[in-house]
Regions:
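Short solvent-exposed loop/turn micro-motifs enriched in small/polar/acidic residues
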Residues: 4-6, 49, 106
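Glycine-rich phosphate-binding P-loop
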Residues: 18-42
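Short, conserved beta-strand segments within well-ordered enzyme catalytic domains
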Residues: 25, 49, 124
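A generic local structural motif
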Residues: 34-36, 82-84, 110
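Conserved NTP phosphate-binding and transfer environment spanning the P-loop NTPase/kinase superfamily
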Residues: 89-143
Length: 143
C-alpha cells in the first residue's frame, strides 16, 4: 500500500551504497543546523534530496523522500543564500537524525522514529561538531 506524499519540515540527503541510494532525514527546529550538516555531508560525496521541506511517503513498509519541484537541487548556505547542488531525485530513507543543541548521551539506547506506520532508527545528534557528518555516515553504514 502506498500512502500519499506528505511534506515534512526536514532536510534529506542520500549516499550511494552497494544497495543503491540510501537516505537520511535530518530533523530539528529552524536554525538548529540541518542545512549546515547536509552541506558538510554533500562535501563528503553525498547528494541532496531536499532542503527544509521534504516530501515523505511510505510504500511496502519503506520510507521514501523527494524534493518539492520548486526547491529541487537548492539548499540554503547560511550567510551565502540559496545555492544549487547536484541532487538525488528520490531515495529510500533509512535513518532519522534529530538535531539538537542540548546535551546528547554518549552511549544512548537504540531509538526509533515512525512515519505512516513505518519505523526506522533515530539518532539524536548535535550537528555543530565537525565530527557530526562522520557520525551520521557511520550510523547509516551500520544499518
Amino acid at each position: 500500500m502506498t500512502a500519499p506524499m506528505q511534506p515534512i519540515h526536514a532536510t534529506a540527503v542520500a549516499r550511494h551504497t552497494p544497495q543503491g541510494w540510501r537516505g537520511v532525514l535530518i530533523q530539528g527546529p529552524s536554525g538548529v543546523g540541518k542545512s549546515d550538516l547536509a552541506l558538510r555531508l554533500i562535501g563528503q560525496g553525498w547528494r541532496l534530496i531536499a532542503d527544509d521541506w521534504t516530501h515523505l511517503w511510505a510504500s511496502d513498509n519503506t520510507l521514501y523522500a523527494s524534493a518539492p519541484t520548486t526547491i529541487a537541487g537548492r539548499i540554503e548556505a547560511r550567510g551565502l543564500g540559496i545555492v544549487t547542488t547536484p541532487f538525488q531525485p528520490i531515495a529510500r530513507i533509512m535513518l532519522a537524525v534529530a538535531c539538537t543543541h542540548e546535551a546528547v548521551e554518549r552511549l544512548p539506547e537504540a531509538a526509533t522514529w515512525t512515519w505512516d506506520d513505518v519505523t526506522i532508527p533515530r539518532l539524536r545528534l548535535d550537528p555543530r561538531p565537525a565530527s557530526a557528518g562522520q557520525v551520521v555516515a557511520t550510523a547509516l553504514a551500520a544499518l
